[in-house]
Amino acid sequence: EMTAATLYATGRTLAGIQIYENMRCADYLQSRSDVDSGNLAITGTSGGGNQTMYAGALEDRFKAVIPVCSVGNYQAYLGVACCMCELLPGALSFTEEWGVLGLVAPRGLMVINATQDGIQFSVAEAKKSLAGAQVVFRQFGKPENIKHVVVESKHDYNQPMREAMYGWVTLHLKGEGDGSPITEPPMETVDRDLLRCFRQGDRPAGFQTVPMLAKRFATQMVRKQLKPLHKEHWEAQRVAKLGMIRRYVGKHSGRVEL
């Protein structure tokens, strides 16, 4: 959480970087000759589910979007401690979570929730968001392209959840089946080292951690800041600075309107 917080002073968020990376993954997949570049899907669970929701909303190359154990609604976030990578600053000033889900329309959206998950990702809270998003899908004439799947489970991405995803992806990417779950064949997971982009100790010399990236952003921004040359110059800066501070700390600077 402290790592994510290092970005805030630069006006960036960890969620933004993660979502950008998902979109760059789409670029990479479309560059490969062994990938059907017109048929991409995105899925993930928990924080990966949030990335799925936002990347799916922003990137229409994803024809099927399946967030897992992540959809609830923003108001439910207010009563619990959530990961900073899942938070969209100021979101409630312009939308609830249903509005983000609605941006996926009319593409295929399947939301998967677990019955024993935290309140912010609970079935009840997700249903509130699904209800709003369903209105948008109906306006596109595609009510069948949004589906809610509830699995008796804790916070997970287990086999029943994956099987639901397989059916949805098969329908929306291949045009086969009716979206019903597809049985997962027996499989063995590969060794984690085989999934590394770089072997242990073999990262490029120029790699950057999030704090390093934040420092780079900050250094670039500070270099562009000018000290006032005269009083009139300062008065112009003063108005601009006050406007920006009020934007971020609130118009009433600590007063709460009841």
Residue ranges of predicted features:
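Cap/lid segment of the alpha/beta-hydrolase catalytic domain
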Residues: 1-26, 30-31, 71-86
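Alpha/beta-hydrolase fold nucleophile elbow
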Residues: 29, 34-46
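Glycine-rich nucleophile elbow surrounding the catalytic serine of serine-hydrolase chemistry
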Residues: 44-56
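Alpha-helical scaffolding within the catalytic cores
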Residues: 50, 88-101, 132-134
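Conserved hydrolase catalytic core segment
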Residues: 57-64
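A short, hydrophobic beta-strand element of the alpha/beta-hydrolase
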Residues: 66-68
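Alpha/beta-hydrolase-fold serine-hydrolase catalytic core, especially in secreted/extracellular enzymes
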Residues: 99, 105, 109-258
